């Protein structure tokens, strides 16, 4: 069952990384990296439904990826993996709202994470749809304007709007300006 979920796995041990990717592959598209720096770059490049991160990485703590992940991907499910039950680490994980799991973990654990990520994504999509419908009515938005808002809500980079809608970039710019004028909201910029 492929649900189209996107997972970011940040784990420095290649064998564990492969195991996690294998366990997540039946639920979506896992991307795996081995360092904090690579994790930050991956988070900047796209949005994810779930982050599975090791605590001890060669260039820092995986815990330092939680805040940037939540900022870039609101509603992201975070699972922190650790080889030892250090009280201070577990405390930090729980304070961040993430889950933790002691290594080793198996495919059954990955299914639980995938199910939670899918549930959160579906809830987020329902809220977005309700908001878009309300805005369409309140601001008398055209179908094109609703589509622009929808692309923004999906996390599509503004530069890619013209490609997705198959129009010129200056057309997108004008449509966004009209949308901003109608709504009086500059958060779309």
Label every model-predicted segment.
Residues 2, 13-32:
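Two-component/phosphorelay signaling modules centered on CheY-like receiver
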Residues 32-50:
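Acidic, metal-coordinating helix/loop segments flanking the phosphotransfer/catalytic sites
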Residues 41, 63-75, 92-95:
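Short amphipathic alpha-helix used as the core "switch/output" element in two-component signaling
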Residues 64, 85-101, 108:
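Alpha4 helix (beta4-alpha4-beta5 surface) of REC/receiver domains from two-component response regulators
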Residues 88, 105-114, 164:
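C-terminal output helix
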Residues 155-189:
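Recognition helix of helix-turn-helix DNA-binding domains
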């Amino acid at each position: 069952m492929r649900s189209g979920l996107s997972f970011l796995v940040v784990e420095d041990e290649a064998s564990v990384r492969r195991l996690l990717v294998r366990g997540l592959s039946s639920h979506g598209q896992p991307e795996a990296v081995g360092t904090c720096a690579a994790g930050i770059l991956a988070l900047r490049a796209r949005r994810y439904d779930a982050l599975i991160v090791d605590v001890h990485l060669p260039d820092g703590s995986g815990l330092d990826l939680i805040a940037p992940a939540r900022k870039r991907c609101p509603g992201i499910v975070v699972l922190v993996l650790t080889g030892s039950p250090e009280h201070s680490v577990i405390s930090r994980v729980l304070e961040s709202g993430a889950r933790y799991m002691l290594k080793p973990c198996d495919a059954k654990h990955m299914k639980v994470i995938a199910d939670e990520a899918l549930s959160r994504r579906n809830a987020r999509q329902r809220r977005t749809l309700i908001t878009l419908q309300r805005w369409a009515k309140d601001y008398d938005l055209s179908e094109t304007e609703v589509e622009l808002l929808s692309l923004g809500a999906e996390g599509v980079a503004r530069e890619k709007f013209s490609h997705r809608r198959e129009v010129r970039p200056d057309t997108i710019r004008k449509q966004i300006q009209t949308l901003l004028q109608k709504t009086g909201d500059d958060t779309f910029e």
